[in-house]
Swiss-Prot record:
Cofactor binding note: Binds 1 pyruvoyl group covalently per subunit.
Involved pathway(s): Phospholipid metabolism; phosphatidylethanolamine biosynthesis; phosphatidylethanolamine from CDP-diacylglycerol: step 2/2
Topology class, membrane: Peripheral membrane protein
Hydrolase listed as a keyword: no
Gene responsible for this protein: psd
UniProt-recorded name of the protein: Phosphatidylserine decarboxylase proenzyme
GO biological process, one term: phosphatidylethanolamine biosynthetic process
Length: 281
């Protein structure tokens, strides 16, 4: 019954208004308010502040500034092996595997289509996927899983349903309904996409090359092309791509290149830069 009420509320809550109000609070530079919110989050979500590069909460200019905190150097080591694809984020590896008949697994018994997720029917090379859920306690920066060059970024407007186990099991096409940002990269194994999926209370999605992309008020899909001579935006495995100002989900799409995952089952905890998959010879 509790889950049904929660799902019902997801459909009647004004998603954008609620998220904008939360964003105003999260961006406040009032010292007393931001310190109260930071301390509340640390206590409620059991955030390990000792992992942060800056452990003094007074040094953070806002709650958002705290949520996109950097980690201490060397805390998330990364493999130098070019055959290893690393995790782009801290969180829970909620689902992963093959894209079968154009569909990805959302949760047990539920799938959604690749076409709906990326709003593009022309891309057919993606055959593997991994979905990582970031809870409020997690590190919120997203990193490059493999060496690559940015070729395109697509903002897709949408809803802002909460993203968690309950909504994944009960809201059809959850990740294809929510606001999202799809970043395409040219890599040695082919095209790879890293997708930032928005959610209720997520105060924003930002990238290192563009700045804040969401939330915004576009009603239509927005496309930025970077695959020409005037741009040369390249990333090494482990480089920072961007961040969420609260929490949500990252989906990585990969081509068929004899990729095997290093995990046997879903819902495993995973850390950024940890080995996610292996590229076979």
């Amino acid at each position: 019954m509790k889950d049904k009420i929660f799902i019902f509320l997801q459909y009647i809550i004004p998603h954008s208004l609620t998220s904008r109000l939360v964003s105003k609070l999260a961006e406040s530079k009032n010292k007393h308010l931001k310190n109260y919110l930071i301390n509340l989050a640390i206590k409620k979500f059991k955030i390990d502040i000792s992992e942060a590069k800056e452990t003094d909460i007074n040094k953070y200019t806002s709650f958002n500034n705290f949520f996109i905190r950097e980690l201490k150097d060397g805390l998330r080591p990364i493999s130098s092996d070019k055959k290893i694809i690393s995790s782009p984020a801290d969180g829970v590896l909620s689902e992963f595997g093959d894209i079968t008949n154009g569909s990805l697994v959302q949760a047990k018994g539920k799938t959604f289509t690749l076409k709906a997720l990326i709003a593009d029917s022309s891309t057919t090379d993606f055959t593997k996927f991994a979905t990582i859920y970031l809870s409020p306690k997690d590190y919120h920066r997203v990193h490059m899983p493999i060496d690559g060059k940015l070729t395109k970024m697509v903002y897709i407007p949408g809803k802002l349903f909460s993203v968690n186990k309950v909504t994944a099991q009960n809201v059809d096409d959850l990740f294809a309904k929510n606001e999202r940002l799809v970043c395409y990269f040219k890599t040695e194994i082919g095209e790879v996409a890293v997708i930032f999926v928005g959610a209720l209370l997520v105060a924003g999605i930002e990238t290192v090359w563009h700045g804040k992309v969401a939330p915004n008020y576009y009603k239509d899909i927005q496309i930025w092309n970077y695959d020409n001579d005037s741009f040369n935006i390249e990333f090494k495995k482990g480089d920072t791509l961007g961040w969420f100002n609260f929490g949500s989900t990252v989906i990585i799409l990969m081509p068929n290149n004899n990729i095997s995952f290093k995990y046997n089952q879903s819902n495993a905890n995973i850390s950024v830069n940890q080995d996610l998959a292996l590229i076979a010879e």
